[in-house]
Amino acid sequence: MTAGRVEPGAPPAATPRPDSDAGSSYPPVEPGYPADGTGGRDGGAGAVDGRAPEPRAVVRVSSPTELRNPRSLDLDLMSVRDVLKVINEDDRRVPAAVTKVLDEIAVAVELAVTALRAGRRVHYFGAGTSGRLGVLDAAELAPTFNTPDRWFCAHLAGGPDAMWRAVEDAEDDETGGAEEARGCVSPGDLVVGLAASGRTPYVLGALGAATGLGADTVLICADPGAVAARSVTVFIGVETGPEVVTGSTRMKAATAQKLVLNGFSTAVMVRLGRVYSNLMIDMVATNAKLRGRMISILVEATDCTEEVAQHALTEADGDLKAALVSLLSGAAVADARAALDRSANQVRGAIALLAG
């Protein structure tokens, strides 16, 4: 695993408290405050060694997400119901904003399909909330569409620990982002950068290195005027505007990124034949509910009985797509599998071959 890559299903181990037994652990400390309660992360009034805190870099971000939202200026004076109403009304603006960038998302989808068909990969690079959304999207694709593990790789600034708590200064590590990209990106891959502001150094470092390696690049952000738009293959700038809580991009900006990622990865799977009609036909049945869903999918797609669907699945050793092609075409399971192999795993293509 590369430094920032997050493997699905592998949360970091709890961190031992320094003054505790080796085997004990403690809940995550709120970002910015040490576990011993002595003050700020830089020492401050609670510093025990008397040294002045080290100076840290300060950046004033110029982004629409950093502006104050006129609809929430009295947020702290509102009732709980009114706070929720303001948030909900602002959230309703996000889907309309995503609608305006559908053409750009479509171009990114075609780039991903081309890369995956050529045996290449799709990488997500992000920091903070944006990076966590990339991890979430990549992790959901295998159980939903039975994608090979290597197809989608998520890289999070600060590594796996950053899924659960903020890793200080990780997003500012432009060199780290570039080095991580150089360690895993190949020519022909697609690299998708996720950054609410459009200027996160870790993400821009990865995108720049990926371009140098011969990979196509996409940037998804909440600033349509981001300077980085000029340096990527596809720029997806969703105009979400100021947040209800100023600068809290875990709100509308993150919602927009989630909607874009939902559409992007789902459309890629549709183009690659992982969906028939609007049914998941490559899903992995990892529990009783999903095994029941496989039966329902066959019944819905073929209008057969549950008993026939169960028998077809048994004959196909649980291979839903092979069972589906067999039922729709009337062919034996072995012939259905052969037709799928010859049609790039596309159900409609396999049925056409068997009909011919």
Task: Give, region by region, the residue ranges found by the protein language model.
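Intrinsically disordered, low-complexity terminal tails and inter-domain linkers enriched
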Residues: G4-E54
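Gly-rich Lys/Arg/Thr-decorated short loops/hinges at beta-loop-alpha junctions or inter-strand turns
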Residues: V86-V94, A154-R165, Y276, D317
